[in-house]
Amino acid sequence: MARFFAFTDADPAMPSLPRPGVSHIAAAAVAAAAYTCVHGAIAWKLFQVHGNDYIVHVKWAEDLYRTGRIAVPHFLYHLLIDAMYAAHLASSFLLGGRLVVIGAYALAAVLIYGVLWVVFQGDRRLGRAPVLLAATGAVLVAQPIARLGWYTIGYLWNDPYNTPTFTLLRPFAVAGFFLTVRFLYGRRRADWGVLLVFVLAVAGGALAKPSYLICLLPAAAIVAVLRILRRAPLSPGALLMGLGLPALAILAGQYLLAYSGRFGAVGYRDGIAWAPLRVMGHYASGLVAKFLLSTAFPLAVPILHWKTARRDGMMQLAWLTFFFGACYVYLLSETVQWAAANFVWSAYSSLFVLFAATMVFWLRQVAAVPVRSWLWLRELVCFGALAAHVIAGVLMDKTCLEWVARH
């Protein structure tokens, strides 16, 4: 993992990294196990609720297996279910769907921990397993700062619990983002192993759910053009082969299948319209407050560390990607099934990655603060915002687990 995600502030070139120790391997395993035990348990129960997204996608997977008919252009979840069923790793399509979701939760936790370890493994304070485990848990658990009984549109969520394709997307989004950072902010030649992982992360994310890639691709393109104009170092070959070509090919195909009106190869057909606040305004009021409560930590950190944050390439890309995600959800809608609010997944996925990037950036700033300094007050404000997100997430998980216990 280290060779895939290694990067530094100024130049994301791969440093020489040791193998992770037993404590870090154990901590990553604990993060994955704890996350799957909580969120996996919630998802496991949701597979028994008739008519929700979990059941619908399992039915589409079975239809794909038996008839070859593709229901939606993002069909990776269905393919994985069918592969598990065909290989006799799951006795039913339902069990296959559950296992894929559990695996995606575990992989997301391991990837977040792995990124943090790559960055901080040389720091005696922040590179310890308990610290990285706590940081990983905070990123995974964080939710909008509100006391809610269940998922509701209006806030922006790191994990809305209710859609398996979004759960599958998140590890691909994390991998795709940090690999893009690695090649966008340094000039180097990618070996075939790293490039293959990059392609798989991008293609897998698009086929799981294209919501994140339609944000990352334009953001990365803008940053790349600006760096070319400024003659700043980047890796154009790796970016083109790992991100640009597979992303454009898959996204173009998905658009033609679902939105062009020219092909009937998939069951899902619709259009895209310019419709500011049509969706979010329909479901919620007080959108400005809900936005701020959903993004308090990612907002507080760059505001309080503005001089450093505005020059940090990772933060630039993360925020620009989230900007596109927010624009999609607040300004666009589908023309027919607009009430499905499918553009929310762009905002949710880009916010999740923004939380991860902000955690990396913030911990770097914490590591640089002298032990006795008034600057710790600034870090306490950031910690307070993060703690509020985490507490809200824990309370939300508690509510969901209580629902699971009652049913």
Where are these regions (language model features)?
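Transmembrane-helix motifs of polytopic, lipid-linked glycan transferases
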Residues: 99-125, 175
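Transmembrane signal-anchor helices characteristic of membrane glycosylation enzymes that use polyprenol
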Residues: 20-52, 108-110, 135-144, 203, ...
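Transmembrane helical bundles and short interhelical boundary loops of multi-pass, membrane-embedded
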Residues: 247-252, 256-407
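Perimembrane helix-loop-helix junctions
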Residues: 15, 216-245, 273-275
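Start-transfer (signal-anchor) and selected internal transmembrane alpha helices
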Residues: 1-39, 125-133
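Membrane-interface micro-motifs in multi-pass membrane enzymes
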Residues: 129-181, 341-350
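Short hydrophobic/aromatic helix or loop-helix immediately within or flanking a transmembrane segment
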Residues: 56-64, 68-98
